[in-house]
């Protein structure tokens, strides 16, 4: 029925906001949508009886089928009276309607298909016009209720609501058409309707595999009381693999129609709820996980899950009809928000990065030749001196001399090759011999500690 499709799109849109904040409004949702739920339940019961009686029908008087149809019409009209006074629905409030709407929607499609299969005995008995008239009255009542429900939908969702209402209304129209055309044409309509289930089977399989992985992850989280959490990381890796495998398997799937996308709402809703529950349970176990040294590992695993989920989301968005693109994005954002909540909870809980007091260059192989710009490196004179007085060498502690010497002063210089050689004597100057290197005003200003540091840097430089 048309109004059911409106509820379907509401449910899909509500699912798009399936985030950690939904639980906060759970009580309000149950109160506001209770009337809608009750109408759905009543229609579900009537359609279920209609379908059962159709299945059992073998020919002859179809009074029971016509009575079932009248009951559906009556329940629909009563639904109009009950829903009329209700305030407009928010997107979040529609979340609780997704499951019931999906159940009724599938049941209506099945009942119409079963009715078409009974066209032979119904038309053969002369009851074709009566069945057609009954279906037309159902469609009229459904149209009125659809218009009412559409008035309860937020305006941004109105175009999608109308489209989905028209598509679901085609279920009844298909039945009307089947009793107005040949059996061959009716069979063709039936065959085209079956295509929906075939096209989405790959998507359902991916969702199912991920759901199984999330469920195992959640069960192990609930059982965890402390200590080694390697099995939780393994569960996370299985979940990541299932997600990436899904990306691979869906690459070549054709785009989804609106109705095909709607058929995935129920499974996606269940998966989203599973993910949110698992993340919350994981956060509840934060203290023992961090104490056991697994905080950083959990954070890293969640980041990998987030990356895999993003890849799947990007792929699925290319398969969704344009008119559902925004809702698809909101849906993926809701799931991503759940994972991000876990990442934020464990952020910074891992061990601090290990810092080394030795520069990274010290771990590299020694260069075959010294650097070409040695002026920034403190290097003692170590090369063979040129003819002339030998330069004053540093002692074993690498502390440059600071006392006055009677020998001629020699100031070592650094050649372009980086080799330290003594300069020519400066003469009978009585000032101390001071090694020349950039950054030191004079040897008298270099303490023993600084000299030691200079020596160490010189060694490290080579």
Curated annotation (Swiss-Prot):
Q: Tell me what this protein is used for.
A: An enzyme-linked immunosorbent assay (ELISA) with antibodies against Mp1 protein as well as Mp1 antigen-based ELISA can be used to detect infections caused by P.marneffei (penicilliosis).
Which cell locations does it reside in? Secreted, Cell wall
Q: Fill in the PTM field for this protein.
A: Mannoprotein, glycosylated.
Name the InterPro entries on file. Cell_wall_mannoprotein_1
Where do transmembrane segments lie in this chain?
none
> What are its GO cellular component terms?
extracellular region; fungal-type cell wall; hyphal cell wall; yeast-form cell wall
Primary localisation category = secreted
Q: Tell me the residue numbers annotated for binding hexadecanoate.
A: 313
Report the domain of life of the source organism.
Answer: Eukaryota
Q: Where is the signal peptide?
A: 1-18
| Its biological purpose | Constitutive protein of the cell wall. Binds fatty acids and may thus serve as a fatty acid transporter between P.marneffei and host cells during infection. Abundant antigen target of host humoral immune response.
Which gene is transcribed and translated to give this protein? MP1
Region called Disordered, residue ranges: 346-429
Any idea which UniProt keywords this protein has? Answer: Cell wall, Lipid-binding, Secreted, Signal
Keyword Aminoacyl-tRNA synthetase found: no
Record's protein name: Cell wall mannoprotein 1
Q: Name one GO molecular function term.
A: structural constituent of cell wall
Q: What is the effect of changing residue 313 to A?
A: 2-fold increase in affinity for palmitic acid. Decreased binding affinity for palmitic acid
Q: Which GO terms describe its biological process?
A: fungal-type cell wall organization
The entry sums up its family as follows: Belongs to the cell wall mannoprotein 1 family.
Give me the stretches of Polar residues compositional bias: 399-420
Q: Where is the composition biased (Low complexity)?
A: 347-366
The entry describes its oligomerization and partners as: Monomer.
């Amino acid at each position: 029925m048309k109004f059911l499709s409106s509820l379907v799109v509401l449910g899909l849109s509500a699912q798009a906001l399936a985030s950690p904040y939904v639980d906060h409004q759970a009580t309000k949702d149950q109160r506001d949508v209770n009337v809608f739920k009750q109408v759905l339940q009543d229609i579900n019961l009537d359609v279920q009886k209609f379908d059962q009686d159709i299945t059992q029908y073998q020919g002859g008087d179809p009074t029971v089928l016509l009575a079932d149809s009248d009951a559906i019409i009556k329940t629909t009209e009563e639904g109009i009276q009950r829903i009329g006074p209700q305030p407009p629905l928010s997107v979040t409030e529609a979340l609780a309607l997704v499951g019931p709407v999906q159940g009724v929607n599938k049941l209506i499609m099945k009942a119409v298909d079963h009715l078409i299969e009974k066209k032979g005995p119904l038309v053969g008995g002369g009851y074709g016009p009566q069945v057609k008239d009954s279906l037309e009255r159902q469609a009229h009542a459904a149209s009125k209720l659809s218009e009412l429900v559409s008035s309860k939908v937020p305006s941004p969702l109105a175009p999608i609501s109308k489209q989905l209402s028209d598509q679901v209304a085609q279920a009844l129209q298909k039945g009307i058409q089947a009793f107005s055309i040949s059996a061959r044409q009716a069979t063709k309509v039936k065959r085209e309707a079956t295509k929906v289930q075939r096209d989405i089977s790959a998507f359902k399989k991916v969702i199912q595999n991920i759901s199984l992985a999330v469920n195992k992850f959640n069960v192990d989280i609930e059982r965890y009381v402390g200590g080694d959490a390697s099995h939780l990381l393994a569960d996370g890796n299985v979940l990541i693999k299932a997600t990436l495998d899904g990306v691979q398997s869906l690459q070549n799937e054709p785009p989804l129609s609106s109705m095909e996308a709607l058929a995935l709402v129920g499974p996606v809703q269940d998966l989203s709820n599973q993910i949110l529950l698992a993340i919350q349970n994981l956060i509840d176990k934060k203290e023992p996980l961090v104490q056991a040294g697994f905080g950083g590992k959990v954070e890293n695993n969640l980041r990998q899950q987030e990356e895999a989920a993003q890849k799947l989301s990007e792929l699925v968005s290319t398969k969704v009809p344009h008119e559902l693109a925004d809702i698809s994005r909101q849906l993926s954002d809701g799931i991503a928000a759940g994972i991000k909540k876990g990442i934020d909870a464990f952020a910074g809980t891992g061990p601090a990065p290990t810092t080394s007091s030795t520069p990274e260059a010290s771990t590299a192989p020694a260069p075959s030749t010294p650097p070409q710009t040695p002026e920034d490196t403190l290097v003692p004179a170590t090369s063979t001196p040129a003819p002339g007085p030998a330069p004053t060498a540093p002692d074993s502690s690498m502390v440059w001399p600071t006392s006055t010497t009677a020998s001629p002063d020699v100031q070592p210089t650094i050649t372009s090759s980086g080799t330290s050689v003594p300069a020519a004597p400066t003469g009978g100057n009585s000032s101390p011999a001071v090694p020349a290197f950039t950054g030191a005003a004079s040897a008298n200003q270099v303490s023993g500690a600084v000299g030691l540091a200079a020596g160490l840097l010189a060694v490290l430089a080579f």
